[in-house]
Amino acid sequence: MVNNMTDLTAQDAAWSTRDHLDDPVIGELRNRFGPDAFTVQATRTGIPVVWVKREQLLEVGDFLKKLPKPYVMLFDLHGMDERLRTHRDGLPAADFSVFYHLISIERNRDIMLKVALSENDLRVPTFTKLFPNANWYERETWEMFGIDIEGHPHLTRIMMPQTWEGHPLRKDYPARATEFDPFELTKAKQDLEMEALTFKPEDWGMKRGTDNEDFMFLNLGPNHPSAHGAFRIILQLDGEEIVDCVPDIGYHHRGAEKMGERQSWHSYIPYTDRIEYLGGCVNEMPYVLAVEKLAGITVSDRVNVIRVMLSELFRINSHLLYISTFIQDVGAMTPVFFAFTDRQKIYDLVEAITGFRMHPAWFRIGGVAHDLPRGWDRLLREFLEWMPKRLDSYEKAALRNTILKGRSQGVAAYGAKEALEWGTTGAGLRATGIDFDVRKWRPYSGYENFDFEVPVGGGVSDCYTRVMLKVEELRQSLRILQQCLDNMPEGPFKADHPLTTPPPKERTLQHIETLITHFLQVSWGPVMPAQESFQMVEATKGINSYYLTSDGSTMSYRTRVRTPSFAHLQQIPSAIRGSLVSDLIVYLGSIDFVMSDVDR
């Protein structure tokens, strides 16, 4: 293995609390807007966090977007109910807040803008004038918190039914089903809900037809096999040509972020597996790393390599399903059955190590659940001998097929500018020629010590390029796994830290305070320091991140989960307008998404 650490991770510990006043962007902002225009918040997010006035928000955003090395991507946007937060020393007074997370690819740096709001004046201007992908994020922010977005093109519910009442992520909104009245579906309510699902083109600025002909409006989903889940797209058609479309999401929404406010730091780990249910341990990684930043925990090299190994196994598992179902969407059936044979080998290996298959919930705050079992290396070696030859056969028999290439090359194509505008990450972004893989540019869990390449496209991201990049990513994951096999360090599988590891039994028998603390941490969960932390990872479908806010409790005050698929589905209309319905099926297969990752 080789060292490839970038300069992004400063020499400070990953969990240090910093205000990032030395970041060049802070100086640029102060030179433009004055030294006292902002409040800079010290956090453990690893990025500058700047509170701006609502009246300056768009001006500051436009300034950042036009810098010599601009902040070109709106990575995330959401809100927080600050009313019950007790640890706010030095922060602007706020009942609610909205944050805007921007990324500069050229700088390889981020900045987070925050706006403080009072309860009797909940409004911010729409950010869609600067970043079109703010649309869905702002709809969700309004829906979950009741924060009005002034100038938004279509401010309506996105996750919840149109008939829903209330704003679920407010602190005064119930978090458990038992806090609601029993649900009853009367005939009148059923009729009301069905009427709410009726699509009205005028609500979306669509015409029902031209002077000479009417458009057809067609529902694709929410139960269509090519929709890859409970996902509905309303198509405006002129013959078979897609004039426009409206993606309709939320059918799989489970309230994952609300659950984070009612689970202990430890007991929330199983929920992370269900965010993107194919990713397994990959989903656990950003959460446990973010909590470890809050706690100030550093894990052993062995833990880092074990985590990387499990993550890459699940990456291969997810990519195999993606590639085979893409081929199936184009029209070839056989490869998907071969792929499930290969995925079974991965599940056998994962089960031997963790005891579970799809949702191991195996990573722990400060380590992993238990050490590697005897014989793990033999199972991994057998898989590494098997998989490369199978991958070659997929490529030769199906992916180089003339018909498949003809159906996917040039379909749903977009360039780097559009990818950045819509918050596209993962293979969809790299296919445009932008070399941005978090494992390389912002290494975590020891990825800087592995020798692997990042596949990058030639400038245009189309369906075929995206799937071929995933094939090469599979090969790179196999390289990483080989290095895990050859270089597994010795050492503990759990950090010796009071917030994660029980004390020695003999000490609990002699010191009552130690026993009391142990009892409280096991029964109620550990208390994390009051701070904010953030961690992004290169997940199976793009960049996944957790932004955690602790108020010095056994539970998270706010758990924000940013998933790649949410951004990718918002991009669908811009990429598919003018194409045929058959092209849409190929495009959906090339995105690589599951609806749990979209809806959370």
Curated annotation (Swiss-Prot):
Pfam families: Complex1_30kDa, Complex1_49kDa
Keywords: Cell inner membrane, Cell membrane, Membrane, Multifunctional enzyme, NAD, Quinone, Translocase, Transport, Ubiquinone
Keyword field contains Glycosyltransferase: no
Main location: membrane
GO cellular component: NADH dehydrogenase complex; plasma membrane
A molecular-function term among this protein's GO annotations: quinone binding
Localization (cell): Cell inner membrane
E.C. code: 7.1.1.-
Enzyme class, first EC level, given as a word: translocase
Main function: NDH-1 shuttles electrons from NADH, via FMN and iron-sulfur (Fe-S) centers, to quinones in the respiratory chain. The immediate electron acceptor for the enzyme in this species is believed to be ubiquinone. Couples the redox reaction to proton translocation (for every two electrons transferred, four hydrogen ions are translocated across the cytoplasmic membrane), and thus conserves the redox energy in a proton gradient.
Subunit structure: NDH-1 is composed of 13 different subunits. Subunits NuoB, CD, E, F, and G constitute the peripheral sector of the complex.
Family statement drawn from the similarity comment of this UniProt entry: In the N-terminal section; belongs to the complex I 30 kDa subunit family. In the C-terminal section; belongs to the complex I 49 kDa subunit family.
Family matches, as PANTHER family: NADH-QUINONE OXIDOREDUCTASE SUBUNIT C_D (PTHR11993:SF45), NADH-UBIQUINONE OXIDOREDUCTASE 49 KDA SUBUNIT (PTHR11993)
HAMAP family: NDH1_NuoCD_1 (MF_01359), NDH1_NuoD (MF_01358)
Designated name of the protein: NADH-quinone oxidoreductase subunit C/D
